[in-house]
Amino acid sequence: MDRDPSEEDSMADLSFEAESPVLPPDELLEGLPSYDWLLQGRERQVFFPPLEALGRSQEPACWSSVLEHSRVPVVTEEVAREALLSFVNSHCCYSSAAAGNLIIQELRQQTLCRYRLETFSESRVSEWTFQPVTNHSVDGPQRGTSPRLWDMKVQVPPMFQEDTRKLQVPHSSLVKECHKCHGRGRYKCSGCHGAGMVRCSSCSGTKRKAKQPRRCHLCSGSGRRRCSTCSGRGNKTCATCKGERKLEHFVQLVIMWKNSLFEFMSPHHLHCPKELLAKARGENLFRDENATVYPIVDFPLQDISLASQRGIEEHSTMLASRARILQQMFFYSGGPFHHS
């Protein structure tokens, strides 16, 4: 295939293609607050201190009134038998005869209590990225100083709904030539090395198949075929800059809203698999939600009180250095468990 020699000079050889830069251009960092940047391994990433959560002015709930109005129901023999029959009927191959005629001699009741703490937090990090330059205007340092990432106003999703968003940091863009194609927009095809043609795979370039007098029908006797990688053009559009020759480097803000969960179940002596107990539904006896919640300090069950303190401390320690706590919510639930 004939091509203009000037086109040959304007294409980069794929074998000498540049690797992606490890660090962003120095010019990109000059307009950013230096104390916001931390060097982690071979990548630069922003790690900002969280904003302090708003304090609470309310007093802790009175647990005596909560317990007074929260009565755990008592399961009778009739209720227990109905529950057993309901379980049997939910399985196609189970017989209800044994469940119906079963003699229940004794019902021993235990109350299983749960404490569940959910903490909704927001963390912000930054990453350097780039994209092909298009017709849109470039928002560079000449338009102002880039704000600190925690100063950027972002709409918070509904509480306890996890989400991730990525935003371009204002005034952080910088245009440079593409590091992959060296600003040419394309490079030589690796399949044909820029020739546009490759050796015929059917006749191996001999123009005829072995022990056959006729010429190869795939290459029409030429011994070469059009390169399928580049469709015979001899070059490919640079996948990094999409042929635009230049890249816009900028800092990208990554905001992550996540839920952290802490659960505790009161000690029990039930001979029941943990996975079944986890699925059992109790009654929510109390629920509290605020920017920060109090640990339970006056609850009759000391295990629940200690668990609430431990859960709040764990979440505070875990999130203090890397996130901002937006909202906390805890549930106290209880339910009767009977075995005969």
Swiss-Prot record:
Instruction: Give the UniProt tissue specificity note.
Output: Widely expressed, with highest levels in the liver, intestine, tongue and underjaw.
Keywords linked to the UniProt accession:
Cytoplasm, Nucleus
Name where it mostly resides. Answer: cytoplasm
Decide whether keyword Nucleus is in the record: yes
> Which superkingdom, per the lineage?
Eukaryota
Entry coiled-coil feature ranges: none
**Cited SUPFAM superfamilies:** DnaJ/Hsp40 cysteine-rich domain
GO MF terms held by the record:
heat shock protein binding; unfolded protein binding
Question: What's a GO biological-process term for it?
Answer: odontogenesis
Q: Which CDD domains match?
A: DnaJ_zf
Signal peptide (UniProt feature, chain positions): none
Subcellular location per UniProt equals:
Cytoplasm; Nucleus
In the UniProt record, which is one GO cellular component term? nucleus
> Positions of the region Disordered?
1-20
Q: Where is the composition biased (Acidic residues)?
A: 1-11
Q: What does this protein do?
A: Plays a role in odontogenesis.
Against PANTHER family, the record matches this protein to: PROTEIN SSUH2 HOMOLOG (PTHR48465:SF1)
Query: What protein is this chain from?
Result: Protein SSUH2 homolog
